[in-house]
Amino acid sequence: MEDTIPVIDVENLSDQTEGKKLRDACEKWGCFRIINHSTPLTLMAEMKRVSEALLDLPVEIKKNNKDVIAGSGYKAPSDVNPLYEALGLYDLGSSQVMQDFCSQLNVTPYQRQVMEAYGKAIHELAVKIGEKMAESLGIFGADFEDWPCQFRINKYHFTPKAIGSLGVQLHTDSGFLTILQDDESVGGLEIVNQSGSFVSVPPFHGTLLVNLGDIAKVWSNGRFFNVKHRVQCKEAAIRFSIATFMLGPRKGNVEAPIEMVDHDHPRLYQPFVYEDFRKLRVSKKMHTGEALELLRLW
């Protein structure tokens, strides 16, 4: 398995050629690596250090990280994902949510400063990428500024006995897009391409990964690919990653813009509220995109 996912230069996204590369990546892969993304490497390194420190806290403290919605707080190792644990907060842009998270885990002022700086940088990047994805389809002025971003720091307890096991089961993300700062030394991420084959995505210093979720497929009226992915243990080493999920509209429905709908491209999915869709995925235990078929019009 080779790393063949596209590489997108964020600095050149105003260029027509790079814009076409972005659209092709969204339609054919649903996943791409970004370079020249303007998030400082020093900030990324500090955020990883903060993540490691927080995930090394005693379990009794980590359990204080309560869910706002199901799955948004502390995730302990489970029968389904015994090698995986995570901490998270539901809305990265909310100062109150950030305050609650920091209070729950006794976060130091410096750690909070790093988290806030990182959150601001990644949110701005997510909005920019969303806008450029829209522009690649000929939609100008799309506004993703108020779409909430869920934040999660992940730890994989990979041991010699775990090699060959899954750290996280195969799934699609429920939201619009995910920006992933992957572990730079411990691999394991795999995506499924459109032919159904697994493609390994090895670490690459200084880059970020973007995965498109179910909402991207709906918003683009079926043009964008919601990529399935998993994490597999390939070596006995602790693995960390940092994920920011741009979910869906804070208010109103998830639906394809009118520019995406015409006689040759009828609306594929009925409009819905993101949170209702998230609950549907959980209640039906449909974690690889199947829940979209329940909302399909054509």
Model features per residue range: what roles?
Residues 1-298:
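Peripheral, non-catalytic segments flanking oxidoreductase cores
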